[in-house]
Amino acid sequence: MRTETDEIRDNLKYLTLLSRDYPSQAAAASEIISTQALLKLPKGTEHFMSDLHGENEAFVHILNSASGVIREKVDQVLGDTVPENIRAELATLIYYPNEKLPQLKARCASEEALDQWYTETLLRLIDICRLVSSKHTREHVRSCLPASCGYILDELLHAHFEDHDKDLYYGQIVGSIIENGRADRFIVRLCELIKHLAVDKLHIVGDLFDRGPRPDIILDLLMRHHNVDIQWGNHDVVWMGAAAGSPICICTVLKTTLAYHNHGMLEDCYGINLRHLQRMAEQFYGEDDLSIWMPHTDAARGPYTEGMLHRCAVMHKAISILMFKLECQVIDRNPDFQMQGRDYLRRIDWSKHTVRIGEKEYPLRDTSFPTVDPAAPAALNPDEQLVLTKLVQSFRQSEKMQQHVEFLYAKGSVYHIENGNLLYHGAVPMTGRGTFATERFEGRLYSGRALMDYCDARARRGYYAPEGSAARQSGQDFLWYLWCGKLSPLFGRSAMTTFERLYVADSSTHTEVKDPYYTWYNDEAVCRRILAEFGLPGSNHIVNGHVPVREKNGESPIKGGGRLVVIDGGFCRAYHEKTGIAGYTLVYSSRTMSLRTHQPFESAEKAVKENLDIISQKNILETENHRILVEDTDEGEVLRERVHDLKQLVTAYQLGWITEARCEDHIW
């Protein structure tokens, strides 16, 4: 029978390495005590968002407000003493300190009035900050403080008043801050600290990219966030493939941005050179009827000149035909994708100007294909090849894009499990009978969790496999499959009907049939089976994005008897009319799990000026019988293992198996 001593002997190599950080019994014991204390703190608040679709202003607002958590803290601290309109102003100040602060200061008619406002605001912010910091150790709070004013903020947050007057003490410090012209900076720092401490973990359940204007701003903010994970959406993986240098993914990304007149973001923010594409497009398509290629526009982002729309439309057509050629090539290379029916350039009858889709032929809305050779429709002409070479070079050399995609790989995955919640963007592919769908890739069968794991691994191959290798090519092709493939867990539909929507007037060809998963996820038994597949008890939750919930038609985001929650963020403006809302977010605190329903967001400028918020409803999904502590979480499991290792280290010191550093602290 193995003893504890046997286990310590087996772990001696690891414990010796651990002793570098804790070179004495005193150091190890001190860490054990602080870690065991941490286990008894309340679980940190988790914030779940999904389907951001590049809508940076709405994202920033929901991030800053933590889906209403910040306002709840303001009301909790000040609700009995401060009028509602002042609390709304204070909440907006916390959301947007740099924008709101000048407005509030401008209302002060005199220096004395400004000093009074500074005093009241600083004291209120300190009280709110004390509340949100109560879930954290003092050491953690200190680590979040800015170096320039950290000592003073630490004093304000952690001072004790058993034997001296609180008002006098605070009054002296706050008065000195104002007198020395540092009030603005302290207000901004307190606002940022409140937002930092209010949410412990941010989960982004896919689709940072799409048609929205500034996905780059979203990624810049996420890269600065203190604790975030990402579950890839199908819009994300196609950008990941583009950054890896996949020609088909590059064309797909460009097709989407041009379709929504958002290519300026690629040029200005990522430094992508579209000059060669524009020149080729004008050469071959400049005189065409471009009516079906005109971009979707948003009046709020205009105005648009006729020349701007023409340039966008002509590039849209050029890149689309290039994309359809490359799709034929990818389908040829990957018969296991089972997409042979979607090589549409080969299914055109060039004499009749029709295309065969399934068993029927349909007339083409645009019959001009000057770069397509009917004898070899998938072949690129020299001009197209040059454009593609330049685009691949531009995407690969974009430093900012590479930084963003490396971050998506480092923080992202196909699915994520944390604290009993299973997070994924799209679907776990299923059959019509409600069983996990099975697919063969590279000679092996995959379904359920194994399919998700395979997708994750092959997606990483597309970026990290050696340049020029077959593995890298295979991985990049698969990133495109994850974007639009029938059994892609990130897509969850029968087909991406891009060609049909462009070229065929008959809307019956535009249908994208949802995976049976989206029927079966209403069944509680199926949701429990999915949870079990990922090693979770049936009482836990699935957090899903991807599919907008049509609330105005009576659809509920809560599926499967409460086991699954759809939180498509509804950030995409195009969906608001269909859904009746601007989507959902989820908040999981130490006491409750709550679904937050949002109304459409107009603009940050209006939110700052009018103290507007966009949360309209809070729906409690689950209330805990007892407050969840850190020891009840996944982090708690890691910390308990750490305590176990540290106790073994102490024993190893006591046995003389590891030499202890000299310690002057005789308490131990």
Describe the function of each predicted region:
Residues M1-W668:
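Feature recognizes metal-dependent phosphohydrolase scaffolds
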